[in-house]
């Protein structure tokens, strides 16, 4: 459930996250629960599903500066996406999906410090727990027509972000 802040071209309060980043919700001709079910129906044996990637080009550091330079440098990330879709790079499994693994992004000639790269590729459990909770609230708005698979995936990610504490060995 992607989210975005409204831009000057969109209606709504600036700085408030909306779960309608493509601004299509008002134009969907049927219930979103049914719409989600329709998309999930494509996942069957032998199906060649599209590869879907999510990118936040606008992440900022603690000083409010963009972590990624953007513009033409975005091609470096697109190259990784293509390599990932073709199966030539494995990526790194995380609770929220597959991220570029060490050395998989072409960084030659890029003025990007190691700390910025580490922050870009980090999964902040607390931040993601809040995001997953917000997604859960969003999805509940489509109950009872929400496909169970979407709720199950939201719960799977939530559990992966909050692993149980390690138990001390008895001895």
Where do the model's predicted regions map?
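Conserved NTP phosphate-binding and transfer environment spanning the P-loop NTPase/kinase superfamily
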Residues: 1-169
